[in-house]
UniProtKB/Swiss-Prot annotation:
Belongs to the UDPGP type 1 family. Its EC number is 2.7.7.-. This is Probable uridylyltransferase SE_1761. Signal peptide: none annotated. It is an enzyme of class 2 (transferase). Keywords: Nucleotidyltransferase, Transferase. UTP binds at M99, A100, G101, G102, K113, Q178, G204, D235, K344. Pfam families: UDPGP. PANTHER family: LD24639P, UDP- GLUCOSE PYROPHOSPHORYLASE. InterPro entries: Nucleotide-diphossugar_trans (IPR029044), UDP-sugar_pyrophosphorylase (IPR039741), UDPGP_fam (IPR002618).
Length: 395
């Protein structure tokens, strides 16, 4: 049975009332789950990120990152980078890591977001085609690591099976799941999902490296003599997956972290890649004062290459949580299903940057390499993604 005094200490006494209405099996499951939780840490998260949340309005320690602009590279530089990139890919120096833990809910679609199809071509297939082309050009089959989540893991694997892995070698596609963390109400209370269990949500893309390690894939990369991990997410329909120019730029610069960015539009709600206290990092749009956000010229588009040695040395180090507030369905006090604002705590992959020692950025043309698919209609929508894919002759 739940410890009422312990629950009251951490503002979770409502669970004691819930328990009175539960069956024996439900009570046992709730008790077991609560025993696994560190209620003090959960309360600290709530206080730090919600009650005392703040934006960054002091930018005295924030400066522009060092970056090169792709459009300013001359033909000789482009050729040199591309040839070095092809050579590195041919020699097996790169693995590709895709973050694809989301659902297509905001697109009005029930399956994994990566399985969403635009005129018959899914987001997964758009990326698989590029890996197939690289294999044809280099003779090397790149290992493709795909991070899923509890909500879409089985469906993602099944989708790949149904589509015969898009003619890519299934032995070189590796799926693994990100971890979860509890969600809270705006009052700081644990909430129950529709099944009557304590609600947990994916812990954000920042868990990608620990999850990769837990699955044994960091060890595999070392055994395969991989030197770099190319990282991207499923949202960007124009992503150039491990394009040889960027691969060559990465190898030539030989930094812990190599990033792609675009020039942001004024007040565009996308994170800014900046330098803070001599470390590159991403400041989320929501964390920056609106008067400050337009001072910086590099918008983060979630495309990076990491030295494997850097990731293995930093993977176990602590990352901070960030707050997101979402409308989520849950049980109310009478076990009825309601939709309420819910606090989600997320890790961001770019917080690992703080442990790096060397950084470089390549700013690329937005119209060629960035078209996020986030909404069913309007901005960053199915329509805009479709138009951009057609413009680039990708569908």
């Amino acid at each position: 049975m739940l410890d009422k005094n312990q629950l009251e200490k951490y503002n979770q006494e409502h669970l004691y009332e819930y328990e009175k209405l539960m069956s024996s099996n439900e009570k046992n499951a709730l008790d077991e789950k609560v025993d696994q939780l560190n209620l003090a840490e959960i309360q600290d998260l709530y206080q730090d990120l919600y009650v005392n949340r703040k934006t960054i309005d002091d930018v005295s320690s924030v400066s522009e990152v060092k970056y090169e602009v792709k459009s300013r590279l001359n033909e000789e530089e482009r050729h040199t980078y591309e040839q070095k990139g092809y050579e590195a890919i041919r020699n097996g120096e790169f693995a590709v890591l895709l973050m694809a833990g989301g659902q297509g809910t905001r697109l009005g679609y029930k399956g994994p977001k990566g399985s969403f199809e635009i005129e018959g071509t899914s987001l997964f297939e758009l990326q698989a085609r590029q890996l197939i082309r690289l294999k044809e050009e280099t003779g090397h089959t790149i290992n493709w690591y795909i991070m899923t989540s509890d909500i879409n893991h089985k469906d993602t694997i099944e989708y790949f099976k149904q589509h015969k892995y898009f003619n890519y070698d299934a032995n070189h596609i590796h799926f693994f799941k990100q971890d979860n963390i509890v969600a809270l109400s705006e009052e700081g209370k644990l909430v129950l999902n529709r099944d009557g269990h304590i609600m947990e949500t994916p812990n954000g893309n920042g868990g990608v490296f620990k999850s990769l390690k837990k699955a044994g894939y960091l060890d595999k990369m070392q055994q395969d003599h991989v030197k770099y991990i190319f990282l991207n997410n499923i949202d960007n329909v124009l992503v150039k997956v491990l394009d040889p120019l960027f691969a060559g730029f990465t190898v030539t610069q030989s930094k812990d972290i190599t990033s792609k960015t675009i020039q942001p539009k004024d007040s565009e709600s996308v994170g800014r890649l900046v330098n803070v206290d001599c470390k590159d990092t991403v400041l989320e749009y929501s964390e920056l004062d609106t008067d400050i956000v337009n001072q910086f010229n590099n918008a983060n588009i979630g495309i990076h290459a990491f030295k494997l040695g850097f990731i293995t040395s930093a993977v176990d180090r602590e990352l901070p949580y960030h707050l997101a507030i979402k409308q989520l369905k849950q049980l109310d006090e009478n076990f009825g299903v309601v939709e309420r604002p819910t606090l989600k705590f997320e890790l961001f992959y770019f917080d690992i940057f703080r442990y790096g020692t060397s950084f470089v950025t390549l700013q690329v043309p937005r119209e060629e390499e960035f078209s996020p698919l986030k909404n069913k209609e309007g901005k960053d929508s199915v329509h805009t993604a479709t138009e951009d894919l057609k413009r680039m002759d990708l569908i």
